[in-house]
Amino acid sequence: MEKNIQTSRQIWRFQAGEPVRIDDPIAREQPVTLKINGEEFATLVCTPTYLQEMAIGFLVSEGLIQAYEEVKTIWIDDRQGFIHIELVRPIDRLHQHLQTKRYMGSCCGMSRQGFVFASDAKTAKKVQTRDVKLNAGDCFRLMAELQENARTFQQTGGVHNAALATKDGLLLMREDVGRHNALDKLYGHCLQNGLSLHGKLVVFSGRLSAEIILKVAKIGCELVLSKSAPTDRALQIAEELDITTVGFIRNRSMNVYTVPERIELKS
């Protein structure tokens, strides 16, 4: 298991009507501050694993950089809780103006305000392909595979899981206390390793909010599967960006919300 992902604490568990003293596994949560070109830029609250991937995915998805090649150096100071990033160029004026040491909680991502609206317009583009085709059985199988491999969630109940997949199965999986962070870790891994995202989809454990759909669009995937529900704004954005959303994948049942052409609905 990746180190630092969970801890434990003694608790009282009420079981079969009786209190029992046990050691209970708890998901770890830690603030990590991104320092870009020597200046504090943002603090992310996250599971302290795959931090370089998370930082790279965050920078690209938020429009600070366009590619991993724009990162000159990146290193982690575990003791102080910093990710030091030196870029090949200064941050543009829009991001400099909004560089106010933003604090991003694990549950809801960052404060959106004007910064992200401009960033989203720049980085969340309409999907241009419809190459991913699934049937209901594929959706059930991929979600089952995600849940079977969600070992930290099984032990703690305290993390979200996200995976990059094809029709045939999961390719890469990441977990984090923050839904957005799990996706940034996936994206950062692909960027660092030059992995093609063509024909890939996202399998996700959490709620499909507007911000999650925007993350999926920025990654470049045309379809997202989730065991949870969407919001109305998320579905509006998914339709605008031609992203297929499938939610409530549970007990051999699922809902196809947007762009159903990628899902074979007939049995």
Curated annotation (Swiss-Prot):
Keywords: Cytoplasm, Molybdenum cofactor biosynthesis. Disulfide bonds: none annotated. GO terms for molecular function: sulfur carrier activity; sulfurtransferase activity. It is found in: Cytoplasm. It comes from the Bacteria. GO terms for cellular component: cytoplasm. InterPro entries: Cytidine_deaminase-like, FdhD. GO terms for biological process: Mo-molybdopterin cofactor biosynthetic process. Pfam families: FdhD-NarQ (PF02634). The active site is at C108 (cysteine persulfide intermediate). Belongs to the FdhD family. Required for formate dehydrogenase (FDH) activity. Acts as a sulfur carrier protein that transfers sulfur from IscS to the molybdenum cofactor prior to its insertion into FDH. This is Sulfur carrier protein FdhD. It comes from Shouchella clausii (strain KSM-K16) (Alkalihalobacillus clausii).
